[in-house]
Design a protein with these regions (language model features):
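Double-stranded DNA-binding cores of transcription factors and transposases
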Residues: 1-14, 18
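Basic, flexible linker segments flanking DNA-binding modules
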Residues: 15, 22-123, 274-281
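Mobile-element integrase/transposase regions
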Residues: 75-146, 168-172, 179-186, 289, ...
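C-terminal domain-tail junction helix/linker
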Residues: 206-210, 232-306
């Protein structure tokens, strides 16, 4: 039986001074030790998840760890989890980088109208959104072209290129079409960059009878889903800098796989994109369309002016 504290003060005196019984003292000590053990178990789980998804956030960690926490009979909420991660230096910070321009809409090629202003997809294969983002290299940048299904958020086509030309987006589009098979009734939405307006890209869309939709401004919120996917890959699943395009390409492929099959999405009721892709009219989306958000912003601005 423990009779003394580590500083040599008898427990009986400590209990008398604090007005607690010996039983209450040991109960509190047990609770403290139990909390320390639980914290260590949680941190180990977090480290395991972060081996694959290096910047996985607090809420998604809690969701993924729910079966483990239940099995271990550990009760921890979001705020306590946040505090535990902060005390252990495991909170995810923002990534800062030198951002190159990936969209050039000052060209002579035809710019198509926006077809999705009031559209909410109800199944996979109805609306694709495409965008280009940069990946930092030790010397310069590489450029990642993505095609994402707007309903399920699944990345259906991607390609990493050394140059900001149409070749990368074309290869990403060809991958998406090859995986989809049936493109009847499909709409493809993108910004008005030259890569998406050129004959090579538009020709493939027309050949596969895919309707062409483009943003009408330079506001990234007009292609919000594509921008969000870019952000998730770069902030959670990819490193800040790679030695060369080959090393970056290997990690991009791994990141897309992790994103599609392992990462739960709050906007998809915590399903992964791969699981959401197989559902029809069953998703509980926690989001509004970019057009609806734009209307709300405009209404709010008018309200502030009156």
């Amino acid at each position: 039986m423990r009779t003394k504290e580590k500083h040599g003060i008898p427990i009986s005196i400590l209990c008398t001074l604090s007005g607690r019984s010996r039983q209450a003292y040991y109960k509190q000590l047990h609770h403290k030790e139990k909390s320390q053990v639980e914290g260590e178990l949680i941190i180990q789980q977090v480290m395991d998840y972060r081996k694959v998804q290096k910047r996985l956030g607090t809420c998604k960690l809690l969701w993924l760890m729910a079966p483990f926490l239940k099995q271990q009979e550990i009760a921890i909420g979001r705020d306590s989890m946040f505090t535990l991660l902060r005390l252990n230096g495991l909170l995810v910070g923002k990534v800062k980088s030198n951002k190159p321009r990936t969209t050039d809409s000052n060209h002579w090629m035809k710019k198509h109208p926006n077809l999705i202003q009031n559209l909410t997809p109800v199944m996979a294969g109805g609306l694709w959104v495409s965008d280009i983002t940069y990946i930092n290299l030790s010397q310069g940048h590489s450029f990642l072209s993505l095609v994402t299904d707007a309903y399920s958020r699944k990345i259906v086509g991607f390609h990493l290129s050394e140059h900001l030309t149409a070749a990368g987006p074309v290869k990403a589009l060809e991958m998406a079409i090859g995986a989809c098979g049936d493109t009847e009734g499909l709409i493809h939405h993108s910004d008005r960059g030259s890569q998406y307006c050129c004959n090579d890209y538009v020709g493939i869309l027309q050949e596969n009878k895919i309707s062409i939709s483009m943003t009408q401004s330079g506001d990234p919120r007009d292609n919000a889903i594509a921008e969000r996917v870019n952000g998730i890959l770069k902030s959670e699943l990819l490193e800040d800098v790679y030695t060369d395009v080959r090393a970056a390409g290997i990690c991009v492929a791994r990141a897309v796989e992790t994103y599609n099959y392992l990462r739960p999405h709050t906007s998809l009721d915590m399903l992964t994109p791969a699981l959401a892709h197989s559902k029809v009219n069953q998703l509980k989306h926690h989001w509004t369309s970019p057009y609806q958000r734009k209307l709300k912003r405009e209404a709010s601005m008018k309200g502030n002016q009156t």
